[in-house]
Amino acid sequence: MAKDKKFVEDITPMDEDFAQWYTDIVKKAELADYSSIRGCMIIRPNGYAIWENIQKYVDTKLKEYGHENVSMPIFIPENLLQKEKDHVEGFAPEVAWVTHGGDDELAERLCVRPTSETLFCEHYAKIVQSYKDLPKLYNQWCSVVRWEKTTRPFLRTTEFLWQEGHTIHETKEEAESHSLKILNMYSRLCEDMLAMPVVMGKKTDKEKFAGADDTYTIESLMHDGKALQAGTSHYLGQNFSKAFAIQFSDRNGKLDYPHYTTWAVTTRLIGAIIMVHGDNSGLKLPPRIAPTQAVIIPVAQHKEGVLEKAEELKERLAKVVRVKLDDSDKMPGWKYSEYEMKGIPLRIEIGPKDIEKNQAVLVRRDNREKTIVSLDEIEIKVQEMLDIIHNSMLEEAKKTRDEKTYVATNMEEFEDTIENKPGFIKAMWCGDKACEDKIREVTGATSRCMPFEQEVVSDTCVCCGKKAKNLVYWGRAY
């Protein structure tokens, strides 16, 4: 029992060592484990089930929008990768190469896909001839490999799971609109499912995707004041279409190049959930994404009728929520701590006295508040409580983000804020890359995005003092 208790309680306080706190939760909540390959992880059932719920939401939305799922090869020939100059230069340092098949050296190196634009372009060039073939709306669920120097489970790994969408369109307007439609869907995923507020905006040219005309992003803020890029959507213009000779006959019979979009979310969203919502007791899962939304804990389960009533309750609730019954012989107190640590949104306690009174006790993971409900209406009450928990978690995350969002009007304010009050910094920018580079060099902060909702917090650039063009969210980031 002592060992069990230590397993539950031994989580490093986040204020003491945030990185170790994060690692403790990943391991103790059984989300992932380290593999024997540096930078690669084993996603355990608890972690993968969260990803499956993210998949379900995104896949359903994409199919509503008319997308189709496909599967592309894991390997890309070197000559294919070289076709788009900016793209290959952007990914070259992270590429893993296959040079041998068995004992035989390959005639041409094969890249293990870091992303699949080149493969989709090669395919689209073969199947598109006319404007009547457009748009092509493809998506794939797969893993990709990027040889990262510094890794951390879910946040930055050598191999990770994602969905990558690749679409081509007849016009620039249609493609740009589609890019923003997907970004908005990602925003809804974060807020409606993950209870995680985001800032929507456009990346600067320095931070945009290699080979893109425009990159749109959703940025979130973690407990420790660092930013995390939660999802991106790119408008690639005609750059890739021209590089790969994708052409179609337009409505006037003239040849033209389609406009390309690509976009993705990854398993780093699981890391974001941990760092936005978690506390010193462990993981705290938003109800709509939680693999198990409620756990039933029988109290004094050795007494007559308790387990039978708990089983009956499970059968009833299983029709409306994802529920688990823990009828193991561990003490109730240990179970409470374990499921708090694993982030189950709602605990349902039922014992002999509750059965006598035809009631159960609901305990929220987010604030530990207890509510007594009648067994006659428990299905409705549990569903209502899960919605209340989601809304409460979202509002709490918004409050934390807003409290850690600051304004700086000059470099002295910027440096003081980034060192002493980690978070988002709203500051004006002149548009000059040299200022962006200097801010990063001096403070370690990068431009996170130029928010769609622009405001003027100063007339001059925070760095050089010249006339400002855009409000930018800045921050140190994962």
From Swiss-Prot:
InterPro entries: aa-tRNA-synt_IIb, aa-tRNA-synth_II, aa-tRNA-synth_II/BPL/LPL, Anticodon-bd, Anticodon-bd_dom_sf, Pro-tRNA-ligase_IIa, Pro-tRNA-ligase_IIa_arc-type, Pro-tRNA_ligase_II_C. The keyword Cytoplasm applies. One of its GO terms (molecular function) is transferase activity. It is found in: Cytoplasm. Its main location: cytoplasm. GO terms for cellular component: aminoacyl-tRNA synthetase multienzyme complex; cytoplasm. Keywords: Aminoacyl-tRNA synthetase, ATP-binding, Cytoplasm, Ligase, Nucleotide-binding, Protein biosynthesis. It catalyses: tRNA(Pro) + L-proline + ATP = L-prolyl-tRNA(Pro) + AMP + diphosphate. Its EC number is 6.1.1.15. Disulfide bonds: none annotated. Catalyzes the attachment of proline to tRNA(Pro) in a two-step reaction: proline is first activated by ATP to form Pro-AMP and then transferred to the acceptor end of tRNA(Pro). Consists of three domains: the N-terminal catalytic domain, the anticodon-binding domain and the C-terminal extension. HAMAP family: Pro_tRNA_synth_type3. Belongs to the class-II aminoacyl-tRNA synthetase family. ProS type 3 subfamily. Homodimer. This is Proline--tRNA ligase. The gene is proS.
